[in-house]
Amino acid sequence: MGRQRRCRWAQPWTLLLLLLGPRLLVTHGWRRKGDKNSENTNILELYLPAVVEYALHVYNMRSQDMNAYKVVRVLRSWLELSEQKEEKGLVFSMELQFARTRCGKFDEDIDNCPFQATPDVNNTITCFFTVDTEPWKTEFQLLNDTCLEGSAE
């Protein structure tokens, strides 16, 4: 009788492990509560797209070129630790590569505009931006921007 009772207790646990086994393998990795790198990575993943869009918008508005530029790729990005009182949000630094498009910078659908493919014109720009932002309020402030014509490669 005692043996039967152990089997009855073992069966629900075995069934539970079989049912949850695949889910346990797919769960996110454990992180220490104060792990800054994990926190920064999550913040970058969440807010970087909006900050990149802002930087591109600023570049297009300040550019003397009548054509719009689009992001080719994010070369590097990181979250700065700010100790200045006037910087109340998150401070992102990023190096972006832009390329000239066939569309004007005031056209409606720049996102779907093809890149310009003229070999005699250098249509690639590499820029470094530092942006202070409170993206949850859609507030952005450009702290630094430096651009160079040509590829960063």
Swiss-Prot record:
InterPro entries linked: CST9-like, Cystatin_dom, Cystatin_sf
Keywords of this entry: Protease inhibitor, Secreted, Signal, Thiol protease inhibitor
Gene3D superfamilies listed in its UniProt record: 3.10.450.10
Leader sequence segment: 1-27
Cell compartment(s), UniProt: Secreted
Annotated Pfam families: Cystatin
Annotated GO CC locations: extracellular space
Chain ranges passing through the membrane: none
UniProt-recorded Gene Ontology molecular function terms: cysteine-type endopeptidase inhibitor activity
UniProt family annotation: Belongs to the cystatin family.
Physiological role: May play a role in hematopoietic differentiation or inflammation.
Protein name, UniProt field: Cystatin-9
Originating organism: Bos taurus (Bovine)
